[in-house]
C-alpha cells in the first residue's frame, strides 16, 4: 500500500500547557474540525475524547498522552496532523518528557487570564531541552480578566522567548468576537459559538491603527531573522505575504521566533486558524535533524563510538522509538512508537536493539483518541501503535534486524514519594502484584518494590496525585481494593568528606576459596550528580574482567545506605589499586569486596541524610497573603519571591516534601478555596541534624 500523504505534509505535534489552560478542550476542537469527532466533548461534562480514562474524566485533567491522527486541508492541500495530548499536571511530567521526545513541534496553550503559570515554565524548559519548535495559543480570551498583551509580555519575560504576534483579538471578555490576521490585514469574525458562521470582513476602523503598528513590528521581526529578507526590507521593498510566511516558518523551525495566536476554544473561536498555523509554521519530519544512534552495546558520547545517522526517508532501514506502553481494555497491551526512518509492514519481525530481542508486529493500529483503525504499513515520520508487544518497553529502539541501531533512550526523573500498600483481602495479593507490575510497565516514574525488612509492598511516584491516580486505576481496571499507609519521603544518604578505603574479602573453606581485594577513593559530588565510577587500575593489578563486577557491587550496595538504609547518592568512586588470586578470585568475590568497601567508606565519610525539596508556587487573593506566607514558614519553607498577578499575589517558595503532605487541603480551608498551588520536585539538600536524628532512631527501632 503506497504512502497516502507525502512526508512534507505530515505534522507530529504535541499540545502542551498548564493544568487549566484549556488544552484538552483545544484538542477536542481540533478533532471536531478535522472531522474525527461527531459531538464535541467537553471536559467539564466529562466526555472529552482525548481524556479516555475514567479518572481523567472525573478530575477534568489529562493523564495519558493519547496519540491521534487528524486530517486538515489548507488551500486545497491535504495534511496529516498527528496530535499527542500531554498532561499539564506536574506529577505527570514524565508523560510530557516522553511525548516531547517524539514530536516535531508543539502548540503551547496559555490561559488568557493567568498567563504563564509555573507548569508552563517547566514544560517550556522541557521543550527547550529537546529543541522543539513551537507556536503559542492564548486561550480563554472570552473570560473575565483575560489580557492578550499581558500574556505576550509574560511569554517574553518569564520564558525568554521572542513572540511573533500574527493575530490580534477583536474585543475581550464578553465582547471577544474574532481575530485580526496581520498578514492578510483582514478580520475573522465569529457570529455564533459553534464555529459554523465565520465571516471574513474589513478590520473595524477603531482597531486599524493598532493592527497596522503590530503588522509593521511583525514584518520587522521576521525580516531580522533572514539576511535575504533584511536586504529587501532595508531597500524599502514591500514583502509579499508568501515571503513573510516562508520567513516566519524558517524562523520558527530554527527556534528564533514563536508565532502567537489567540482564541477561545470552548466557544469554538480561533481553532481553525490555529490548525492553519500548525501546517504553515511547524516542521514536518523532513525539517528536523536526522536521528542519530549507536551500535548496540555502545554508549553515545564515549570515545571512539561511531555515531550512526538515519535519514528521514521511506527507503532508509526501519528505525523507530517506543515512547509509551498502554494497557488497553479491548486489545491488551499497546506500544506506541514513532518511526524515524524506513517503513514496516504488519506481520514483519523487527529487532528490539535495546534488549537484543525479536519482536513481531502482528497488528499495527493508527489511533483516534478512543477508536482505532488497522493499517497495513507505517512510514517514516509517522506515529502508530503495535498490539501485544512481548519484549518492548518505553524508551526502547525497534529497528531492521539487518541494520541494528540504538537511539538515545528517554530519561526519567527519580520518584520522590513512597507509600506502603496492602490488599484488603488475602485473595487479592496476587491480583495486586500483577496490577502494580503492569502499571509500572506503563509508567517509568512509578516503581514498586518489597521492603526486605517489613515485607510490605512499597510504591513510589512523583507526587500524591500521581500515586492516587495509580491506586484508583488499580481499583477500576484490575478490581483490586488496597489499604494505603501514610506517604513517606524518599530520603537519600551521602558522604561529606573524601575517604580512602581498602577492603579484602577472603574466604577459605576447603576446596575453591574466594578472594577479592580493592582500594577505592570515595569523594562527595555536588548535589544531583548521582554516582560516578572511575577505573584507574594500571598494570593489571585487578584483571579487566573483574572491573564491571566492582562497579556493580558498588551500585548494588548504594541502594541501601548505612545510617538509615536510604539510597546513597552523589559519590565519586575511583578504583585505583587492589590485588587478585589466580585460583580463588571471581566476579562474585570482587562484587562482595566492593560492596563491603562502600559500606565501610560511608560510615567513615561523615555521612548525612538528604531530603527532597519541592518548588512550590501558590496563587492567592491579597487578603490571604499573610496566612499563606505564615503557613510556608511553619513548614520550614524558604520564600523565594512574590509578585502581583492581576489582583492576586503569587508566592514562590522551596519547601521540604516532608512538610507538604496534605498541603492542598489545608490551603483550601485556610483561603476558602480561593488559592491554588502547584509543586514539583527541585533538588535534595541536607536534613537539619535534629530531624535526621529522629529519622535514624525511628528507622533503627523498626
UniProtKB/Swiss-Prot annotation:
Gene Ontology terms: cellular component: cytoplasm
Species for this entry: Chloroflexus aurantiacus (strain ATCC 29366 / DSM 635 / J-10-fl)
Domain tr-type G: 8-286
Binding-site residues, GTP: 17-24, 85-89, 139-142
Record-linked InterPro entries: EF-G-like_DII, EFG_II, EFG_III, EFG_III/V, EFG_IV, EFG_V, EFG_V-like, G_TR_CS
Protein name per the record: Elongation factor G
GO molecular function: GTP binding; GTPase activity; translation elongation factor activity
Keywords: Cytoplasm, Elongation factor, GTP-binding, Nucleotide-binding, Protein biosynthesis
Family named by the database record: Belongs to the TRAFAC class translation factor GTPase superfamily. Classic translation factor GTPase family. EF-G/EF-2 subfamily.
Keyword hit for Cytoplasm: yes
HAMAP family linked to this entry: EF_G_EF_2_B (MF_00054_B)
Pfam assignment, any one: GTP_EFTU
Keyword Calcium in annotation: no
GO biological process: ribosome disassembly
Function of the molecule: Catalyzes the GTP-dependent ribosomal translocation step during translation elongation. During this step, the ribosome changes from the pre-translocational (PRE) to the post-translocational (POST) state as the newly formed A-site-bound peptidyl-tRNA and P-site-bound deacylated tRNA move to the P and E sites, respectively. Catalyzes the coordinated movement of the two tRNA molecules, the mRNA and conformational changes in the ribosome.
Subcellular location field: Cytoplasm
